[in-house]
Amino acid sequence: MTEPTGITELLLSRIRDVADYPEPGVVFKDITPLLADPGAFAALTDALAEAAGRTGATKVVGLEARGFILGAPVALRAGLGFIPVRKAGKLPGATLSQAYDLEYGSAEIEVHAEDLTAGDRVLVVDDVLATGGTAEASLELIRRAGAEVAGLAVLMELGFLGGRARLEPALAGAPLEALLTV
């Protein structure tokens, strides 16, 4: 087997397609083989940490749940603080929350009220950009906390779902970086 040469090839070679999951007709992009490969995981972490540096971020927000897996090591590698954005009801103490619409219903995310303040420049990190609903809510939450959005960085963008177009107004000029687009 030939070893992949560039980061794009390396990352793509470690993402497994799972047909008909979680429902028939869906092809799930499973990143667990990438996470299990220390070289690929380190390359991913380095690439996202470089994005944090380019944006001038002072903190990294990770979106529940796989955004935690990627965001925490990115923050550590970049020398920044890590802030988890969780589903409603998962954080103790005072929180700020943001509701957003789903295809069928709504959801809510939260952050500790004291974790983001004026002067913070925040990079949002997640595994996949699909429709952009959760990311859009996180950008609003960051701004409501008084912080500035430095950008959004994801491992993979599912371009056919239109998340980038949805996020353009919410990004307000902040960059959106996807290492892979499928």
Swiss-Prot record:
This protein's record includes keyword Cytoplasm: yes
Places the protein is found: Cytoplasm
Main location class: cytoplasm
Reactions listed under catalytic activity: AMP + diphosphate = 5-phospho-alpha-D-ribose 1-diphosphate + adenine
CDD domains reported in the protein's UniProt record: PRTases_typeI
One GO cellular component term noted in the UniProt record for this chain: cytoplasm
Entry EC no(s): 2.4.2.7
Example GO BP: adenine salvage
Alphabetically ordered keywords of this record: Cytoplasm, Glycosyltransferase, Purine salvage, Transferase
SUPFAM superfamilies documented for this protein: PRTase-like
GO MF annotation terms: adenine binding; adenine phosphoribosyltransferase activity; AMP binding
Pathway field: Purine metabolism; AMP biosynthesis via salvage pathway; AMP from adenine: step 1/1
Matching HAMAP family: Aden_phosphoribosyltr (MF_00004)
Job description of the protein: Catalyzes a salvage reaction resulting in the formation of AMP, that is energically less costly than de novo synthesis.
Family to which the UniProt record says this protein belongs: Belongs to the purine/pyrimidine phosphoribosyltransferase family.
Quaternary data: Homodimer.
PANTHER family to which the protein is assigned, alphabetical: ADENINE PHOSPHORIBOSYLTRANSFERASE
Name of the protein this chain belongs to: Adenine phosphoribosyltransferase
Gene behind this protein: apt
